């Protein structure tokens, strides 16, 4: 979870003809499957696409991420560039120590929506409570489950020969024989 503070600003009230000072607003945010699902239901397009989001779409996603109750709508208009950078860094953070070293990285052109991720969760028996996790952590868990569920990779002839050679050498040394 990320907590940001939207700073106070001074506004002019034309009706009363006076300046008023707004209060700082604390927002607790969570980049999760739940927030992505809310955003996609409003905008009718995939959140996880390569397309850039408009400022309106970005601010609305921040609304979808918000866990803080009763936030006045005007607070979202006061979000600073510093707040946006902090949120962007939080969204991009892996939130896990797990890394992948897949040499045969293929580009998947499948459009990923929240429903596709929910399908993956069901197919892999991942509990629905994980929908509230940071999205990158959930996607890492899905990737780990996919890797662990794959059958063991078959060795080619060269790998088998090298393995047998090292096993034979270890046996010769353990039994003090020449072969």
Feature locations, PLM:
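Alpha-helical oligomerization segments
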Residues: 142-179
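Short, hydrophobic/proline-enriched secondary-structure or compact coil segments at domain edges
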Residues: 56-68
């Amino acid at each position: 979870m990320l907590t940001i503070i939207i700073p106070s600003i001074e506004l002019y009230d034309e009706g009363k003809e006076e300046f008023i000072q707004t209060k700082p607003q604390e927002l607790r945010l969570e980049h999760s499957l739940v927030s992505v699902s809310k955003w996609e239901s409003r905008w009718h397009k995939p959140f996880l696409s390569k397309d850039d989001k408009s400022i309106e779409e970005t601010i609305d996603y921040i609304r979808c991420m918000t866990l803080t109750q009763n936030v006045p709508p005007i607070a979202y208009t006061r979000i600073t560039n510093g707040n946006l950078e902090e949120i962007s860094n939080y969204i991009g953070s892996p939130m896990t120590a797990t890394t992948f070293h897949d040499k045969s990285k293929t580009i998947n052109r499948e459009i990923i929506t929240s429903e596709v991720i929910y399908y993956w969760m069901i197919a892999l028996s991942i509990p629905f409570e994980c929908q509230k996790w940071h999205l990158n952590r959930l996607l890492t868990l899905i990737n780990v489950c996919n890797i662990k569920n794959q059958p063991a990779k078959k060795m080619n002839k060269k790998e088998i020969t090298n393995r047998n050679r090292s096993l034979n050498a270890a046996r010769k040394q353990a039994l003090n024989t020449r072969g």
